[in-house]
Amino acid sequence: MASQNIQHFFHPDSGTISYVVADNDTKEAIIIDPVADYDVQRDVISYESAQEIIDHIKKHELHIVAILETHVHADHLSGSFYLSKTLNVPIYVSEGVKEVYSQWKDELCLSELYHFEHFLLENEHMDFGHSHLEVISTPGHTPSDLTFKIGDALFVGDSLFYHGTGRADFPGGSAEKMFESIRKLYELKDSTEVYLCHNYPESEDKLVYKTTIGEERHDNVFVDEETTQTQFVEKREGRDHQLPPPKLIKPALEYNLTAHHS
């Protein structure tokens, strides 16, 4: 059975966690949810965080074959475009990205949608080395949310947080769909490892980047194994009404959909 080395990278400014997943037999690897750095005051994009990933790749002599995004991020700028150009590898996103683009095109006066090399659908598969990745569609946070299953590891984007969930109030978001997506993940065995996209620790040494399906089924404050859809929707929508929009929502969506920054 194929095995993988999973290395996480934490971006404190946005609370985002990126991953490099390498097939141990062949050193072929993928990057999931990389981040670019954005100085709001100076309106400058830089790539120190992406360079950390490149340094890791070089140190371990990995061969990157793909960059994958779990969804269109609204709280940070993606490092995918920079890494794709630097490493000469394709970017894989959800087919739902097209819907997100349509919802925001006029409001944000967006230029053309970036020509992503691959638009992924439910149950698609890809291999890197001897490792096998399965695409699970998990809409709710946005229409574009995907979960990637590699062996007994899940990369869940913003569908699940540690003992919580992402918000569901963005255009095209749906608490009902999020509930259905999470329940689908809860059907997997309890020992399945869940690699998170966000965590907001007081300090980096308290970062939680991984949980399990069993732990979330028992301890998730928004949706445990006994929560009904009605209960979840009421709690999730109630919380979302209290939350302000992400500070970087406009520049993040523009950049992450078009690779342009105006």
Give short role names for the model-derived ranges.
Residues A2-H60, T147-V156:
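Conserved beta-strand hairpin/beta-sheet module of binuclear metal-dependent hydrolase folds
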Residues S14, D37-D39, V72-L77, K98-Y101, ...:
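Active-site environment of divalent metal-dependent phosphoester hydrolases
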Residues A36-H130, H218-D219, D224:
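Active-site HxH/HxHxD metal-binding segment of metal-dependent hydrolases
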Residues P143-L188, V194:
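A contiguous binding-surface segment within folded domains or other stable secondary-structure elements
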Residues A2-N5, E180-E193, C197-S262:
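Accessory terminal helices/loops
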Residues I32, H63-V72, Y92-S94, T138-G140, ...:
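Active-site neighborhood of phospho(di)ester-bond hydrolases with catalytic His/Asp-centered motifs
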Residues N5-F9, V20, N123-I150:
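Core dinuclear metal-dependent hydrolase active-site scaffold
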